């Protein structure tokens, strides 16, 4: 910084970049942090750089799946990035017409998910598209401590929430 005779460092990024920028500021450097994250989870921002682009990509993926899901009467689970926040999944799910949206902020009840799928089938809608945030969690898992949940996931044959959901939906 000083060797290069910089007057200011501009940092683009999410939570980690924001923390690093703040540490550099505390060391006396002039730092500007620009919020760039698809998660849209930085306090004080309405919409971060990258969020709208990520919505478009997720919407395109869900839109492309609609035809296949409808023509083959299937249940599709689309897992959307976002870590522990569901903004991207919510926006993309609503914009693309997902039938069920599961967010990390609202633990889901697998029985209610299955009931919603069965209800759609009874209404003559032979397909269902679920938009699921990667951090979505069941009500049962939400009761576990962080340590217990980590251990459960490490010992699970399901690498992501989508695999877990698919197995549960098939089982029920």
Question: Which residues fall in each region the model found?
Answer:
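Accessory alpha-helical/coil subdomains and C-terminal extensions
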Residues: 8-13, 21-23, 51-70, 79-172
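Glycine/threonine-rich beta-strand-loop-alpha-helix active-site module
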Residues: 28-64
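Short, glycine/serine-rich, charged loops/turns that create anion-binding
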Residues: 16, 38, 136
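N-terminal glycine-rich phosphate/adenylate-binding segment common to multiple enzyme folds
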Residues: 1-33
């Amino acid at each position: 910084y000083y060797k290069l005779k910089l007057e200011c460092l501009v940092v683009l990024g999410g939570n980690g970049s924001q923390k690093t920028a703040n540490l550099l500021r505390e060391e006396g450097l002039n730092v500007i942090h620009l919020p760039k994250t698809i998660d849209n989870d930085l306090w004080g921002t309405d919409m971060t750089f990258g969020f709208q682009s990520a919505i478009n990509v997720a919407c395109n993926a869900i839109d492309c799946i609609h035809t296949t899901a409808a023509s083959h009467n299937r249940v599709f689970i689309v897992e959307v990035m976002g870590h522990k926040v569901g903004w991207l999944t919510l926006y993309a799910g609503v914009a693309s017409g997902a039938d069920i949206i599961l967010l990390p902020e609202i633990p889901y009840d697998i029985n209610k998910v299955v009931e919603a799928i069965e209800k759609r089938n009874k209404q003559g809608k032979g397909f269902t598209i679920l938009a699921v945030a990667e951090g979505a969690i069941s009500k049962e898992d939400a009761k576990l401590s962080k340590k217990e949940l980590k251990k459960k996931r490490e010992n699970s044959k399901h690498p992501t929430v989508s695999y877990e959901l698919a197995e549960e939906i098939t089982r029920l």
